[in-house]
Amino acid sequence: MAEAENIVVETAEKIFADLADAQTITHDKEGRWKAPLWQALSEAGLPLAWVSEEHGGSGVSLGDGFGVLGAAGRFAIAVPLAETMLAGWLLEQAGIASPDGEMTIAPANPRDRITRNADGTLSGRARGVPFAKAAKHIAVIASGPDGAVIALVDASKLRVEDHLNLANDANDTVIFDKVEPITVKPAPKGFDQSSLMLMGGVVRSLQIAGALESMLDISVRYAGERVAFEKPIAKFQAVQH
């Protein structure tokens, strides 16, 4: 298991290092680096890591996926990798096959609700949906008369109001106006919107942990290289504390 996890994470890190290093991203103001990065990630099966092979994915473990998310955080990858992984995981809970391409999830806010109407369509408003404008499909958990359902929706059928968060990442509002889903199935017993929120929190926490790890490495390296008064600043007692 540990060997498999190392292979998955090493593959992700190599792709990030080759196609999304800081210098490449900084010099490419138009974001042309994103398309080849996404293609490489897709060819490696990483966006659908948590989807079973039966449903079009790679079928790796949660732990493998967590390692990939930590690596994505270390490289500060601004593509919907985490969102697509989470969407695939959500669809897998109901046995729905995942399509190719970028995905995201809705709702992303615990106060928002998507409702399944009597005619099977979906209605509601979801705020703060990451990368909704870039997504080709959205995985949705909705409440219906018979309990929670999980649905796959064509993003082109939705109205998306694009916004940015403090990190300048897509943080959109998605309006469901009696939208007919591609596929809809009942959620597993005991699985509801709070289940998605909890998993989403884990996903973001792993990305944050990876980013903090990278920040620590950069700070320690800088302190060892930066010289003041003829010695590295890491040697100063104030810095060591």
Map each language-model feature to its residues.
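Amphipathic, small/basic residue-rich leader segments at the start of a protein or domain
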Residues: 1-78
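Short, contiguous, pocket-lining structural segments
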Residues: 4-8, 29-33, 130, 204-211, ...
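An alpha-helix initiation/capping motif
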Residues: 6, 10, 31-35, 84-88, ...
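Structural signal for well-ordered, non-membrane alpha-helices
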Residues: 13-17, 213, 217-220, 224
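Glycine-rich cofactor-pocket loops
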Residues: 24-32, 189-200, 217-241
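Buried hydrophobic packing segments
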Residues: 65-68, 72, 87-91, 205, ...
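N-terminal glycine-rich flavin-associated loop
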Residues: 77-94
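FAD-binding core of flavoproteins
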Residues: 89, 96-213
